[in-house]
Amino acid sequence: EQVTQRGVNNLSNLINLGFDTLVISSEPQSWKKILRAGFLNFTNWAKASEQAIVASTPSIAIKYNIPLILHGENPGLQLGDMKTMGRNGYDGNNLRYMNTVAGGNLEWLLDEGISEENLISFRYPSIQEFEDSNIQIVYLGWFWKDWSIINNGMYSATNGLQVRTDIVNNTGDLTNVFSLDEDWVSLNQMIKYYKFGFGRASD
């Protein structure tokens, strides 16, 4: 219900380009309760979805014995989320401490009556699980000299990425390449601006 046709087309484009792709989603009724809980508890409907996105890669890596995870941007260096900083600029193993992931704490969802069974995709693996599986997250942006939202967006657009066409006054997205799979992000960034005084345009 939430994904845009643009998002569907971009996922199809990745598959057509030859990327192995896993699509993970939550049970729809629980998902609606989870969105509501995020909004009422944190004024951030996207909190849980960010938990699921960030948790999915190490969970899959552990399941399939993949020791190396490549992430794009370092949120500490690029977005100011300093709790994610690791031993050096490319170490991403502290991603669990990202503001919206908060160490993987799901108590707030359990308190809302969401069952553990319906929170499997939101559960971030423990430090012990990381160590037992020898997992290492590496930020590509540290090594990629011209890494930027604009450069990555331009490169991707030349390879089939569909970008936003709406004006920045409506979206707050100066580049038209942020969070393209859905349009609720504009509302979330507006609320973020009202809460903290900055949003997508000034991150």
Can you annotate each of these PLM segments?
Residues 2-203:
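Nucleotide-activated chemistry modules centered on ATP-dependent adenylation/adenylyltransferase
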